[in-house]
């Protein structure tokens, strides 16, 4: 089962599969990321406490 990251972007609830996430970085207490949105680059952010473990693992690997 693939992990999904739920986040809000411009007031809209979104969800992205962790396998589509390309780049992850920390901004204060938020975890920001870019992901493949059907050929375009999508952006998202989630608070550190709401981030799934797999997303935090990607952050540590950089």
Curated annotation (Swiss-Prot):
This is DNA-binding protein 7b. The keyword Ribosomal protein does not apply. The lineage of its organism: Archaea, Thermoproteota, Thermoprotei, Sulfolobales, Sulfolobaceae. Hyperthermostable. It comes from the Archaea. Can constrain negative DNA supercoils. May be involved in maintaining the integrity of the genome at high temperature. Belongs to the 7 kDa DNA-binding/endoribonuclease P2 family. Monomer. It is found in: Cytoplasm. InterPro entries: Chromo-like_dom_sf, DNA-bd_7a-e_arc. The keyword GTP-binding does not apply. GO terms for cellular component: cytoplasm. Highly stable from pH 0 to pH 12. Pfam families: 7kD_DNA_binding. GO terms for molecular function: DNA binding; RNA endonuclease activity. Keywords: Cytoplasm, DNA-binding.
